């Protein structure tokens, strides 16, 4: 790996295009280095993972709305929309599928200087691959690039400290991945990356206060923008440049300003793209930084029960990282995170609610743990409001560690009972993390798929999909990666414009 310094340049500066970060990513995208077998296998795992969470969300209202919007754009040679037959304009197919993947906050993650869900790259690449009749091998190569670009951006450039949403790293990564998939030249990829970033620099209000369904639509929109950017670039049009480093560019006015230098790691030419291997999926449907606390709560439940049960708890303090405290903890100062009437999207960003329910139930369910009946249970509300988070410098240091063996996304829970008894335990990483108690392997991804698809995807369709996806390196018909279900029970929606 090499480190590329990224900072603002005046328009009058001699700043060669070859030094632009967007150009560096275009070089990465066109590097013909082979995808390693373990990366190829992990890409298959993540396609299975996305299908699993899409099956669980396919009938929900936001996903139904996005699907109906896509259905307004049929195309003879297009992309497939999860759940239904037919072909649709690829940018709209990607949009619908992106919402389905993101709706339940239940797929993969990478956390470093910024947050990300790199599996959001898969819907736009798959939709375009289907429309272009690309091969499974081409899709694998494109996804490897997209993950690599997103992982390196997340390592090098923090967005949230300036209240910019993390989809600003998704537009460029999806555009770069599309470049690899489509075998286009560096100049085209460079221009597509510029437009994709320019159109996806949204604020983090989508994840603040009363969180709406736009949290699921936001990455889908970024994927759609990446496809449109690539289409326009392929037709010979240019984009704002240098998009990161320009005098009026992203760094100068949206991020740390004209005097700041970002350090973005990049693979050397010919170095395999291994970024996906440093990402991790979720066992539980909730914000990633709550994964380890959920497992910790489940582990602590027998001790709490032996001490009298949750009704005898006086206080719970979760000592954790800066990110966890300020994004999903009491450091956010969001009263909505303590509100029993809050939206599901808000509750899955409240570690106080999540820890309370996991401690009481000993399990976490992608639907039942979020019902209004569950969130308004009096004893749950009482416990929930006894929980607070505290930033611990050691947890913050471990969160940002460059050593995978030391990097941690968990917390230490200090539970004080009414009689003064103190119960303490901590967990650094979730059980499903590569270094966790039960690291996810292929069989776990398949089990997650079967569990979430049960009652929604018929058994024969499950088997057909699993056979196709596990044959991806040799698969010529990528339409086989779509899954059809009975959508007659889809959520009711209002009429729109499209």
Curated annotation (Swiss-Prot):
<protein>
    <recommendedName>
        <fullName>2-methylcitrate dehydratase 1</fullName>
        <ecNumber>4.2.1.79</ecNumber>
    </recommendedName>
</protein>
<dbReference type="InterPro" id="IPR005656">
    <property type="entry name" value="MmgE_PrpD"/>
</dbReference>
<comment type="similarity">
    <text>Belongs to the PrpD family.</text>
</comment>
<dbReference type="InterPro" id="IPR042188">
    <property type="entry name" value="MmgE/PrpD_sf_2"/>
</dbReference>
<dbReference type="Pfam" id="PF19305">
    <property type="entry name" value="MmgE_PrpD_C"/>
</dbReference>
<comment type="function">
    <text>Catalyzes the dehydration of 2-methylcitrate (2-MC) to yield the cis isomer 2-methyl-aconitate.</text>
</comment>
<dbReference type="InterPro" id="IPR042183">
    <property type="entry name" value="MmgE/PrpD_sf_1"/>
</dbReference>
<dbReference type="GO" id="GO:0047547">
    <property type="term" value="F:2-methylcitrate dehydratase activity"/>
</dbReference>
<dbReference type="Pfam" id="PF03972">
    <property type="entry name" value="MmgE_PrpD_N"/>
</dbReference>
<comment type="subunit">
    <text>Monomer.</text>
</comment>
<dbReference type="InterPro" id="IPR053420">
    <property type="entry name" value="2-Methylcitrate_Dehydratase"/>
</dbReference>
<keyword id="KW-0456">Lyase</keyword>
<dbReference type="InterPro" id="IPR045337">
    <property type="entry name" value="MmgE_PrpD_C"/>
</dbReference>
<dbReference type="InterPro" id="IPR045336">
    <property type="entry name" value="MmgE_PrpD_N"/>
</dbReference>
<dbReference type="InterPro" id="IPR036148">
    <property type="entry name" value="MmgE/PrpD_sf"/>
</dbReference>
């Amino acid at each position: 790996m090499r480190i590329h310094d990224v900072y603002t340049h005046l328009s009058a500066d001699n700043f060669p295009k070859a030094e632009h970060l967007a150009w560096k990513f275009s070089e990465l995208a066109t590097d013909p280095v082979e995808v390693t077998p373990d990366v190829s296998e992990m890409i298959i795992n993540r396609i299975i993972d996305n299908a699993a969470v899409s099956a669980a969300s396919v009938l929900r209202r936001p996903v139904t709305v996005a699907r109906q919007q896509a259905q307004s754009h049929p195309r003879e040679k297009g992309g497939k929309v999860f759940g239904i037959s037919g072909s649709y304009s690829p940018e709209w197919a990607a949009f619908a599928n992106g919402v389905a993947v993101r709706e339940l906050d239940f797929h993969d993650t990478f956390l470093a200087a910024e947050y990300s869900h790199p599996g959001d790259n898969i819907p736009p690449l798959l939709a375009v691959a289907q429309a272009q009749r690309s091969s499974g091998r081409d899709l694998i190569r494109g996804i490897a690039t997209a993950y690599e670009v997103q992982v390196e951006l997340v390592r090098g450039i923090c967005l949230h400290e300036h209240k910019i949403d993390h989809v600003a790293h998704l537009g460029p990564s999806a555009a770069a991945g599309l470049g690899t998939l489509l075998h286009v030249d560096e100049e085209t990829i460079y221009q597509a990356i510029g437009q994709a970033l320019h159109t996806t620099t949204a604020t983090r209000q989508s994840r603040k206060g009363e969180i709406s369904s736009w949290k699921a639509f936001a990455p889908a929109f970024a994927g759609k923008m990446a496809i449109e950017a690539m289409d326009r670039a392929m037709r010979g049009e240019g984009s704002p440049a240098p998009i990161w480093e320009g005098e009026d560019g992203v760094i100068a006015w949206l991020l740390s300003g004209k005097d700041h230098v970002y350090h973005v790691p990049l693979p050397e030419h010919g170095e395999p793209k291994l970024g996906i291997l440093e990402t991790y999926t979720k066992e539980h449907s909730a914000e990633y930084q709550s994964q380890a606390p959920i497992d910790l709560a489940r582990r602590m439940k027998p001790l709490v029960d032996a001490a009298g049960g949750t009704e005898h708890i006086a206080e719970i303090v979760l000592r954790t990282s800066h990110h966890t405290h300020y994004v999903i903890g009491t450091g956010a100062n969001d009263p909505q995170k303590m509100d029993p009437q809050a939206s599901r999207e808000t509750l899955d960003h409240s570690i106080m609610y999540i820890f309370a329910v996991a401690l009481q139930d000993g399990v976490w369910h992608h639907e039942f743990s979020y019902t209004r009946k569950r969130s308004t249970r009096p004893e749950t509300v009482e416990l929930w409001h006894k929980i607070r988070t505290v930033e611990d410098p050691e947890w913050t240091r471990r969160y940002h560690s460059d050593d995978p063996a030391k990097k941690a996304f968990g917390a230490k829970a200090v539970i004080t009972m009414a009689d003064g008894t103190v119960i303490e335990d901590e967990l650094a990483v979730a059980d499903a993390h590569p270094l966790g108690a039960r690291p996810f392997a292929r069989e776990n991804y398949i089990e997650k798929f079967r569990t979430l698809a049960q009652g929604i995807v018929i058994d024969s369709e499950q088997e057909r999909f699993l056979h196709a996806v596990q044959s991806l390196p040799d698969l010529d018909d990528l339409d086989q990666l779509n899954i059809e279900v009975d959508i007659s029970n889809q959520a009711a929606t209002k009429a729109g414009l499209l």
